[in-house]
Protein backbone atom coordinates (compact mmCIF):
# COMPACT_ATOMS: atom_id res chain seq x y z
CA UNK A 1 0.00 0.00 0.00
CA UNK A 2 1.31 3.41 -0.99
CA UNK A 3 0.10 6.95 -0.39
CA UNK A 4 -0.24 8.19 -3.96
CA UNK A 5 -1.63 11.69 -3.30
CA UNK A 6 -1.87 14.14 -0.41
CA UNK A 7 -4.14 17.20 -0.41
CA UNK A 8 -3.57 19.52 2.53
CA UNK A 9 -5.21 22.70 3.82
CA UNK A 10 -3.46 24.64 6.54
CA UNK A 11 -5.82 25.99 9.19
CA UNK A 12 -5.58 28.90 11.59
CA UNK A 13 -7.04 27.95 14.98
CA UNK A 14 -6.45 28.78 18.62
CA UNK A 15 -5.92 25.07 19.25
CA UNK A 16 -3.17 22.69 18.26
CA UNK A 17 -4.55 21.65 14.85
CA UNK A 18 -2.35 22.98 12.05
CA UNK A 19 -3.83 21.39 8.91
CA UNK A 20 -6.43 19.01 7.51
CA UNK A 21 -5.43 16.47 4.87
CA UNK A 22 -6.94 13.97 2.49
CA UNK A 23 -4.84 11.08 1.23
CA UNK A 24 -5.27 8.71 -1.69
CA UNK A 25 -4.08 5.13 -1.29
CA UNK A 26 -2.88 3.22 -4.37
CA UNK A 27 -4.83 5.63 -6.64
CA UNK A 28 -7.98 3.81 -5.46
CA UNK A 29 -9.13 4.86 -1.99
CA UNK A 30 -9.41 8.29 -0.32
CA UNK A 31 -9.38 9.09 3.38
CA UNK A 32 -10.53 12.62 4.32
CA UNK A 33 -10.26 14.67 7.52
CA UNK A 34 -6.81 13.57 8.63
CA UNK A 35 -5.50 16.23 11.00
CA UNK A 36 -1.98 17.55 11.54
CA UNK A 37 -1.64 18.29 15.26
CA UNK A 38 1.12 20.21 17.05
CA UNK A 39 1.65 17.93 20.05
CA UNK A 40 4.00 18.09 23.02
CA UNK A 41 6.63 16.12 21.08
CA UNK A 42 6.18 17.83 17.71
CA UNK A 43 3.80 17.39 14.80
CA UNK A 44 1.81 14.21 14.40
CA UNK A 45 -1.04 12.92 12.24
CA UNK A 46 -4.44 12.14 13.77
CA UNK A 47 -6.79 9.91 11.83
CA UNK A 48 -10.43 10.93 11.20
CA UNK A 49 -12.62 10.39 14.25
CA UNK A 50 -16.06 11.08 15.65
CA UNK A 51 -17.29 11.75 19.17
CA UNK A 52 -19.25 8.96 20.85
CA UNK A 53 -22.32 9.69 23.02
CA UNK A 54 -20.15 9.38 26.14
CA UNK A 55 -17.77 12.10 24.86
CA UNK A 56 -14.87 9.93 23.76
CA UNK A 57 -13.37 10.10 20.27
CA UNK A 58 -13.15 6.94 18.14
CA UNK A 59 -11.21 6.64 14.90
CA UNK A 60 -13.39 6.17 11.83
CA UNK A 61 -10.49 4.72 9.83
CA UNK A 62 -6.95 3.94 10.93
CA UNK A 63 -3.95 1.83 9.93
CA UNK A 64 -3.59 -1.49 11.72
CA UNK A 65 0.20 -1.65 11.75
CA UNK A 66 3.03 0.76 12.50
CA UNK A 67 4.54 0.50 9.01
CA UNK A 68 1.38 1.79 7.35
CA UNK A 69 0.94 4.47 10.02
CA UNK A 70 4.51 5.59 9.32
CA UNK A 71 3.88 5.81 5.57
CA UNK A 72 0.77 7.95 6.12
CA UNK A 73 2.44 10.20 8.68
CA UNK A 74 5.55 10.69 6.52
CA UNK A 75 3.52 11.54 3.41
CA UNK A 76 1.25 14.03 5.21
CA UNK A 77 4.03 15.73 7.19
CA UNK A 78 6.28 15.94 4.10
CA UNK A 79 3.48 17.78 2.29
CA UNK A 80 2.90 20.00 5.34
CA UNK A 81 6.60 20.98 5.42
CA UNK A 82 6.73 21.42 1.63
CA UNK A 83 3.84 23.88 1.80
CA UNK A 84 5.58 25.64 4.68
CA UNK A 85 8.35 26.60 2.27
CA UNK A 86 5.88 28.47 0.04
CA UNK A 87 5.92 32.22 0.72
CA UNK A 88 2.20 32.97 0.67
CA UNK A 89 -0.02 30.36 2.25
CA UNK A 90 -3.74 30.84 2.54
CA UNK A 91 -5.02 29.72 5.90
CA UNK A 92 -8.55 28.51 6.37
CA UNK A 93 -10.28 29.91 9.44
CA UNK A 94 -11.76 27.06 11.46
CA UNK A 95 -14.52 27.66 13.97
CA UNK A 96 -15.12 31.26 12.93
CA UNK A 97 -18.74 32.27 12.56
Swiss-Prot record:
GO terms for biological process: asexual sporulation; division septum assembly; sporulation resulting in formation of a cellular spore. Pfam families: SpoVG (PF04026). Belongs to the SpoVG family. It comes from the Bacteria. Essential for sporulation. Interferes with or is a negative regulator of the pathway leading to asymmetric septation. NCBIfam families: PRK13259.1 (NF009749). This is Putative septation protein SpoVG. The lineage of its organism: Bacteria, Bacillati, Bacillota, Bacilli, Bacillales. Keywords: Cell cycle, Cell division, Septation, Sporulation.
Amino acid sequence: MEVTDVRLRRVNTDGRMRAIASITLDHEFVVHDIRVIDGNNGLFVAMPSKRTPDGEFRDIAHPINSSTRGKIQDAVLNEYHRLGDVEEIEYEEIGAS
